[in-house]
Amino acid sequence: IKFNKNGSIKVKKIKQNNNLKKLEKNLLLIYTSINRTAHEIASSYVNKLTKSKKKYIESIITHVNEGEKILKTGNIDDFGELLHSSWMLKKKLSSAISNSKIDDLYNHALLSGASGGKLLGAGGGGFLLLYMKKKYRKKFFLKSKKLINIPFKFSNIGSEVIYNNFQS
């Protein structure tokens, strides 16, 4: 999705292929059980953008093209490192984007075998997307039994919620 300066939006479809399926099977979506107001988190950095913070955002935006290249070339394991890089840049935007619970969870995921991940949306809580191969997941969940894993699949038609019955 490209957001143009004139307010228009251009959507470029990514063909469903085996690379996308490989990516899907290596992603975990974890609910952090931390509720927050996205508007409050986003306003903590959007309204106070310095030159250096604008550079972080510009770098994050370039990751979209890098992600597309990864999907085209099939080097799917590089996606974890890309998520990690995006997360490190995003955390530099505001101290409200992460907290000790999120940092502990993320570090536990890395120590368990994840190659990267990032908090989705504005930050501060919500959902953590991790790139973790199946062989590392047992170790991850053994030490984190209270984590809520949200199963998901990519869809050609956009976001859909079939049924949601998780509780924090």
Where are these regions (language model features)?
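C-terminal nucleotide
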Residues: 1-118, 129-168
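Glycine-rich active-site/cofactor-binding loop and its immediate structural neighborhood
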Residues: 125
